[in-house]
């Protein structure tokens, strides 16, 4: 389908029953779903529901993106296998999507037999067609863990601004991009060791092949978003520039993923098998439902295929993915729809401010998921513009639009209709001019949704709601009800109000599916579709007792949501204070009397069995406790107890501390963690070097009976150099 065809379809009524495959980007299986993710899934779900309401054959496909080094290392950190980790995360992600009404036809995993077979098939087809190259490359290598390191697993000092602890590809302080080899004093995030350079054979997809450039120049002309088209043309350059570079599609063992056929110890890079995971998830669905999978993906398929993504992964979905499909003999995407980023209260999501909001915390705090669906929809359009969740505006808009304008229409009319007219509408009222206006607007609202102009659809819907409320205010049914002589007028007013409410509910159904279900049950009607705009309520079907469909947002709920997501040192201090009052130290792990104990430079101090002497607040104030970030860690040669920690305490230089916690932690487990240190302890010279402080850890009073050491780890949001007080 060309861009002009797509525009014509989006501008008007559906042209016959279409077959459509839709995907959202796959969430990575090493973290929680947050509201930034939900922008995309809600956007996609609204579009899918819109098309279902037209009666099209449409399948919404998703999966967890499960492969790669981060998943492998996260699993190791948690003491589980990668498969155990991704199975747990899949359940968490599925729970969150269900909570927000994201209606996948199949939510699967990229770690599946279907994905392995499809990835191998596509790779071998590309190899047969001459699109796979093999060459030696030099990479950073961790000599301790014996593994090659991705750029983001190398840190060091920025070569430009000299900021510490920066990633191997760019500086978060000054914004400079560079090669990992440019870092000053680089170290492996995995082990803390200095990386070395090592060569390895890698496999490349030859995106630089002239056939790829020719195909992509033609394919880009069909993209619906001008911003995407312009960005792709920038990447492609002018004819003859040859700006496209070959794409490394392989990684070396150890790696969690699929091994490349005929290349032992080499694995597909996650970005090769992740988009193939769209097809794998769909194939799994086809096998269960008896659908013809090949008819949807073969080169001459007449089906449609749309990908909803964030603008940060446009490169993969508009260059690599369509080229992979084209030259492996498959159909290419009909279109790719990219959205912008989410900010909260005008700023990036922040753990310290509590605005890095997880989906589960939103649900646990008792907020209605359809509030957020409505607010995001009101902000979304067909462009790649960023959107902002302003929490004050969120509260005001939901309370005004959904409660004040929309659901109140039903609550104002239902009681009179049930009490006076047995819940049956007046047949003649269904021809009221106001209702004709609403019915006439439904096709345009549906077209706005299909064009991804959700904000326009909702603005038009709320303008209609204003008109309905104006009608009710003018008719004054509460006044009409006082005089039996006004029964006909009262019946008409309530009937017009409820039919208008049905039409508004139809207009809002893609955004508020659960409210729509409640409306359908209340009115005693079948599930609403766009074709039902002209099918008014019937006097033959009485409405049922009205149940509240939506409550107002309480400001206290917003406060509770922020508190639930805020990484706060006050919370840590309060817990320590409460623990002390109960006879337990701040580092209490299990409530069995474990105490916080400082770990001196040489070895872990044994906690005193008895209570410590009482000290004054002045004595305590002498201790300068600071948040420290462990930027490097290594075992001390010749010692079976000590680890050498390099700590960032917010000063111009790092500090060196020896700590007797080797029995409890491997060096790679500690790198990147925050902890608490005594910053004003006099330096101590040891045979291994100078120790410039001590870190804090907890241990049981009787370490022989209950062994274990536990370093103190502040909540997210704490920063190196912050005082603990």
From Swiss-Prot:
It holds the Pfam family tRNA_bind. Its EC number is 6.1.1.10. Signal peptide: none annotated. A motif ('HIGH' region) lies at residues 27-37. InterPro entries: aa-tRNA-synth_I_CS, Anticodon_Met, Met-tRNA-synth_bsu_C, Met-tRNA_ligase_1, Met-tRNA_synth, Methionyl/Leucyl_tRNA_Synth, MetRS_core, MetRS_Zn. The keyword Transmembrane does not apply. One of its GO terms (molecular function) is metal ion binding. Its cofactor is Zn(2+). The keyword ATP-binding applies. It comes from the Bacteria. Binds 1 zinc ion per subunit. GO terms for biological process: methionyl-tRNA aminoacylation. Is required not only for elongation of protein synthesis but also for the initiation of all mRNA translation through initiator tRNA(fMet) aminoacylation. Belongs to the class-I aminoacyl-tRNA synthetase family. MetG type 1 subfamily. Homodimer. This is Methionine--tRNA ligase. The lineage of its organism: Bacteria, Pseudomonadati, Pseudomonadota, Betaproteobacteria, Burkholderiales. The gene is metG.
